[in-house]
Structure formats: structure tokens, C-alpha cells
A protein has these predicted regions:
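C-terminal functional extensions of proteins
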Residues: 193-249
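Electropositive, gly/pro-rich neighborhoods at or near active sites that engage anionic ligands
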Residues: 1-100, 228-249
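Active-site glycine-rich loop that binds ribose-phosphate moieties when present
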Residues: 139-158, 164-171
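Long, charge-dense
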Residues: 92, 96-149
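Short gly/pro/ser/thr-enriched loop/turn and capping motifs at secondary-structure boundaries
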Residues: 107-112, 173, 190-194, 208-210
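Alpha-helix C-terminal capping/helix-to-coil transition sites in glycosyltransferase folds
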Residues: 70, 158-159
Length: 249
């Protein structure tokens, strides 16, 4: 993608870089019209977190990674914003887990799918990774959903037992949970339908959450915690934001 004009010394350089990635992705036809609105909403919650990864987010990331490692058929699901903001991190995590990536978007058009598949395969080649990227020929549907957004791959999302779906919409999250899957979401809004309905919710900015998981992968085996409480994680995320709001008042 093109160079960013902002200086790396800018205190919010990371945020400016993410905005730039979205601008470039939009030019390539990778994003839905509402993509920038969704990102801006997430940024507002990140301000309240102090743009940092909390202890509760690390707890959720560790549990998520343990479930992915122990899974029989883990899958990482990618939409337009995820590809633009953290495509490399998704591919590196998929490589470490030995699992496929499936491009699965809410507003599905042939043009967007072509752009997203092209981008992810470009990044895969640039990173020198051997990762299966699905999405070009869906051959199944997610029960409970209608229209193009229900399309998926049998060998990907449909057969998965544990699925990471960052920035997922509420309907699809609930449909995947109803299928009996362990559903992991990354969502800065602890009150969203996806965050509330998922099995594991990482309340953190996307690239930070994925980099946390990559660091944990390199650190050695993870252990599934049978006492993990997602409601407690959501509450801790919300409390961290309330503290941030009070401190900034």
C-alpha cells in the first residue's frame, strides 16, 4: 500500500497508520461503504481504553489461543476491515496454527471478493507463507442466515470447531454459536451483540490483539482454562473504559 504522510514521531501514529490502510483498501475496492464508520466507532472505544491492551484482554487472548491450538479444525475468518488493518498478522497466526483463512464478508459482491482475495494472496506471497486462503468458491451456507452473507466454504467455516471472527456482525456471530462452535471475536465494544454473544471476546484493538496472540504462540504451549468467564472479561473491559472516561473528565 502507499506511503503514509504522518511522521512516526506523532503520538497517535499507529492510529493514523490504520486509517491510512483503510483509505488505501477503499481505493482497491476491498471495503464496504460503511467500513470507515465502523472503524471510527471502534477508535472511540479505544480512546477510553487508553489505546492499550488490558490484563483482561490478555486473559481472553490466552484462552482464545489455547482453544485454537487444541481445535480439530480451527479457522480464521476475515472481512474487509480485518484484511486491510491486520492481514499480515492474520496470515502469520494462521501459519503458526496450520489452519486456513476464509474471506467472509457481510456485503458480498464478486468485485469485493476478487479485491480481497487478491490482496490476501499478495500478502501471503510477500511473507513467504504457505496458508490456504478460502473464499473464491463457497460451497455451503451458514444455517440461520440468508442472502450472500450466508455463503461459506464447507472445508472452512462450516466444518470449523473453533473460529476466530474479528470485527464480526452480531447475526453471524450468533449463527456460528448456534452451530455449536467456539466463537472468538475481537471487538472494542464490550456491549455489542457480537461481544455479548461470543464464546470468547477480546476487548482490544485488532492489530494489538493479534500481535498479543502471536507473542503468546512464540512463548510456548497454551493451556485451556476451564474457569474462564467471558462475562467477567466483558465487565473488566467496560470498567477499564469507565475509568478512562473518569480520568479524562
Amino acid at each position: 500500500m502507499g506511503d503514509i504522510a504522518a511522521d512516526p514521531s506523532h503520538p497517535r501514529y499507529a492510529s493514523l497508520l490504520m486509517r491510512h490502510r483503510l483509505e488505501e483498501a477503499a481505493k482497491r475496492g476491498m471495503l464496504a461503504g460503511s467500513a470507515l464508520i465502523a472503524h471510527g466507532r471502534g477508535e472511540a472505544f479505544d480512546y477510553l481504553l487508553g489505546e492499550r491492551t488490558t490484563d483482561s484482554a490478555r486473559t481472553a487472548a490466552a484462552q482464545a489461543l489455547a482453544c485454537l491450538v487444541e481445535a480439530t479444525h480451527p479457522v480464521l475468518s476475515v472481512n474487509g476491515n480485518v484484511a486491510a488493518l491486520a492481514g499480515d498478522e492474520v496470515l502469520r497466526l494462521a501459519s503458526a496454527l496450520g489452519c486456513p483463512v476464509e474471506i467472509n464478508i457481510f456485503y458480498r459482491t464478486p468485485e469485493r471478493m476478487e479485491a480481497l482475495l487478491g490482496f490476501m494472496n499478495e500478502r501471503k506471497a510477500a511473507l513467504g507463507l504457505d496458508v490456504v486462503v478460502l473464499g473464491d468458491a463457497p460451497n455451503a451456507t451458514i444455517p440461520g442466515l440468508k442472502g450472500p452473507r450466508a455463503a461459506c466454504h464447507q472445508e472452512g467455516i462450516l466444518d470449523s470447531d473453533v473460529i476466530l471472527v474479528p470485527l464480526e456482525d452480531g447475526d453471524r456471530c450468533h449463527a456460528l454459536v448456534a452451530m455449536g462452535k467456539t466463537v472468538i471475536v475481537i471487538d472494542l465494544n464490550p456491549l455489542s451483540r457480537s461481544a455479548q454473544g461470543a464464546t470468547i471476546t477480546i476487548v482490544d484493538e485488532l492489530s494489538r490483539a493479534l500481535n498479543t496472540m502471536l507473542e503468546m504462540v512464540e512463548g510456548g504451549p497454551m493451556t485451556n482454562d476451564p474457569t474462564y468467564d467471558n462475562n467477567a472479561v466483558l465487565d473488566a473491559g467496560l470498567q477499564a473504559m469507565l475509568r478512562g472516561l473518569n480520568e479524562g473528565a
